[in-house]
């Protein structure tokens, strides 16, 4: 049953399934054996990254693939038979045209009542750490990826599909050049994963002044920088507890589901503590597909830190956060408390369509908001107005 909305929605978390040549079509020849390759291993098509089989996605060809939203209940914390996550996919189906074709996707968006969306990677958010030991290859891989993305999806197609080029900060000069290139092609968003940045001299905060050329461009152009969940540098810490130190999608682990490490919380803490938003007062940050529980923990720590060392902050960092950060909560989160913390103008919906953990029907997000007594005006702000605001450049 289709959920009827009194407005056309803007979804801040839509995904494509990458073409098999997304990383290779435009890859510079010097990096063909150092970045992404396809190989047949034991009769199966496998993705090699840096010469090693990569298992971030069980089937990175995405054909066949599970239907949208089949694990909705699991991610709401409901799995009464304790079925293995891999068994919840149901019958796989051939890849649908709209997962890879922008015009087919527009037709689906029309049927969904969707005005526009941020279009984000599936495989791409798991690749940065896989190449962290070869930073030139990492930078080259995402240069190639972004050119594929521009070619197949565009960065502002019909002013409705806003595909976000992926920026790795591992090489500050390359990051600034990539952003300049994307801005010339009307990019409204860029995407990266949270956590410290791997550089030739070690891990560094993304707010380190070495990355100011990138942040200055983002600030001056008035785009939105999205932090999206994915494979981060934090995965290595799980190894310290005897867990796998790399992510395999949908492989269950009790400890992984409870561990308190939080790259999104720490990333925002670092951006605030190191004064990024006061160096660049026009920055807009959106957190996507990392939920919102981290924001509550962060606010507790910000309040205490400001109470202890207020002289080290230009202002209460919670107020800085509220000006510069937009949060896309999981639909199963405490949406009422988030409204108090962030305000209705800084919450954006994200359906995660067509992923298995997302919503089968993006418009049904409305029901989750209504369950927390959001007013009609607040629902429209979260499901339309705020996303459109972020998709509009706001030059400094």
Language-model-detected regions and their locations in the chain:
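Divalent metal-dependent hydrolysis catalytic cores, especially in the metallo-beta-lactamase
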Residues: 86-97, 107-132, 160-168, 188-192
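Catalytic pocket-lining loop regions of alpha/beta-barrel enzymes
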Residues: 140, 159-161, 167, 173, ...
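Mid-to-C-terminal alpha-helical segments outside catalytic/metal-binding sites
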Residues: 2-10, 19-116, 147-155, 177-180, ...
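Active-site loop-helix segments enriched in His/Asp/Glu that coordinate
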Residues: 111-113, 124-153, 172-181, 201, ...
């Amino acid at each position: 049953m289709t959920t009827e909305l009194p407005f056309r929605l803007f979804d801040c978390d839509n995904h494509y399934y990458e073409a098999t040549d997304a990383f290779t079509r435009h890859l510079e020849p010097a990096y063909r054996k150092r970045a992404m390759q396809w190989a047949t291993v034991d009769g199966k098509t496998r993705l090699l990254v840096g010469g090693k089989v990569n298992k971030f996605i069980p089937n990175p060809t995405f054909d066949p693939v599970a239907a949208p939203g089949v694990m909705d209940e699991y991610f709401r914390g409901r799995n009464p038979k304790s079925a293995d996550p891999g068994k919840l996919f149901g019958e796989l189906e051939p890849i649908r045209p709209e997962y890879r074709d922008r015009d087919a996707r527009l037709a689906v968006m029309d049927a969904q009542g969707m005005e526009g969306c941020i279009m984000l990677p599936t495989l791409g958010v798991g690749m940065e750490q896989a190449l962290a030991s070869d930073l030139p290859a990492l930078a080259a891989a995402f240069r190639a990826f972004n050119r594929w993305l521009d070619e197949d999806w565009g960065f502002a197609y019909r002013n409705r599909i806003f595909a976000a080029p992926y920026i790795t900060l591992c090489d500050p000069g390359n990051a600034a050049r990539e952003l300049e290139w994307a801005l010339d092609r009307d990019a409204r968003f860029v995407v990266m994963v949270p956590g410290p940045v791997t550089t030739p001299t070690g891990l560094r905060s993304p707010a380190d002044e070495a990355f100011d050329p990138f942040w200055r461009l983002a600030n001056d152009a008035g785009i939105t920088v999205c932090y999206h969940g994915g494979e981060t540098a934090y995965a290595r810490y799980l190894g310290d507890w005897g867990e796998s130190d790399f992510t395999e999608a949908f492989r269950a682990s009790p400890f992984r589901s409870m561990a308190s490490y939080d790259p999104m919380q720490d990333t925002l803490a670092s951006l605030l503590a190191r004064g990024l938003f006061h160096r660049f007062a026009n920055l807009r940050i959106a957190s996507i597909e990392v939920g919102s529980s981290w924001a509550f923990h962060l606010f507790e720590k910000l309040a205490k830190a400001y109470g202890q060392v207020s002289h080290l902050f230009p202002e209460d960092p919670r107020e800085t956060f509220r000006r510069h950060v937009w949060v896309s909560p999981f639909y199963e989160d405490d949406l009422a408390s988030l409204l108090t913390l962030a305000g209705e103008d800084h919450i954006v919906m994200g359906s995660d369509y067509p992923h298995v953990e997302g919503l089968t029907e993006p418009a049904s997000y409305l029901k989750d908001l209504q369950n927390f007594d959001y007013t009609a005006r607040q629902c429209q702000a979260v499901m339309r107005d705020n996303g459109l605001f972020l998709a509009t450049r706001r030059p400094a």
